[in-house]
Amino acid sequence: MAQSGRRGDPEEIFEILVTSFSRGSGRAAAEGDLCWRPATDVFETETEFVVQMDLAGLDPARIQVEFDGDALTVRGIRSEPAAPGRKHYHTMEIDVGPFVRRVPVIAGVDAASAQARYRGGFLFVNFRKGEDRPGRRRQIAIDR
């Protein structure tokens, strides 16, 4: 939600700040950037643990997916779409700039089975259920 050039009334700005602080673990601020956090669903099926993120408008090449043994971290950058001429915003709700989202992963998943794919503006990361095999930190390639 933090964007340069955004204007709003003081109550709205205060709400954005409070929401930003209460949502995160402080990790994004520690990395030096004000980051937005994509909407995320986490669910399981009979055979898999699935993390689904709303990352509409992103180039998958600008998304990094990493698993560090107990959490999945997704980070990247969404650029503002170019528009001809000068823009005068009436409403500005689409987050742009850097983002980071850390999602705890339940015990009982096979870390080595992690697969990521980007389809229709959503990132899906699937882990097979099974024997709890904690994995070392590793990058997960995104199937496009």
Identify the function of each model-found stretch:
Residues 78, 82-102:
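An anionic, turn-rich surface loop/hairpin at beta-sheet edges
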Residues 49-55, 125-127:
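Short, well-ordered beta-strand segments enriched in hydrophobic/aromatic residues
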Residues 37, 100, 137:
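Short coil/loop residues immediately preceding or within conserved phosphate-binding loops
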Residues 59-64, 104-134:
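Beta-rich strand-turn-strand
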Residues 131-144:
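Intrinsically disordered, low-complexity terminal tails
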Residues 59-87:
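Core FKBP-type peptidyl-prolyl cis-trans isomerase
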Residues 1-52, 73-75, 79-84, 141-144:
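N-terminal leader/pre-domain low-complexity segments
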